[in-house]
C-alpha cells in the first residue's frame, strides 16, 4: 500500500507541486497519508516520521518566536497538513499562521 502511494507520486511528482500551489491540502493529505487508513502496520511509521516530529518542531518554533519577531519558516508539505500538522498545532497554542503563496 505504501509502495503504491509512493509509486503514484513518482509517476507524476509535478502533481504534488501543483496541488500545493493550488492549496489543495485535501488531495495532498490523501496522497501522503492515504496508506495509513485501514493499515495499522503503518501507524508507528507515521507517528515517528510525521506526528512526533511535528510536535517536536512545533515546540521549537514556539520557542523561536517568543521574542516577538516575525519568522519565515519552510517545512516539507507533509508536515503542514491536517489536524496534526504544524500549522494546526501552532494555532492550538494561539499563534497566527498564514499560508504564503509564491504566485
Q: Model-derived features: where do they sit?
A:
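Hydrophobic, often amphipathic alpha-helical segments used for membrane interaction and targeting
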Residues: 1-66, 85
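Short coil/turn segments at beta-strand junctions that form active-site/ligand-binding loops
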Residues: 68-70
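C-terminal structured interaction module
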Residues: 72-103
Amino acid at each position: 500500500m505504501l509502495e503504491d502511494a509512493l509509486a503514484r507520486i513518482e509517476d507524476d511528482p509535478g502533481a504534488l507541486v501543483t496541488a500545493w500551489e493550488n492549496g489543495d491540502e485535501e488531495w495532498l493529505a490523501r496522497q501522503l497519508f492515504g496508506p495509513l487508513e485501514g493499515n495499522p502496520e503503518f501507524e508507528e511509521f507515521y507517528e515517528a516520521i510525521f506526528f512526533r516530529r511535528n510536535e517536536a518542531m512545533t515546540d521549537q518554533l514556539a520557542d523561536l518566536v517568543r521574542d516577538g519577531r516575525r519568522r519565515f519558516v519552510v517545512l516539507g508539505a507533509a508536515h503542514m497538513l491536517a489536524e496534526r500538522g504544524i500549522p494546526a498545532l501552532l494555532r492550538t497554542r494561539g499563534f497566527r499562521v498564514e499560508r504564503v503563496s509564491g504566485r
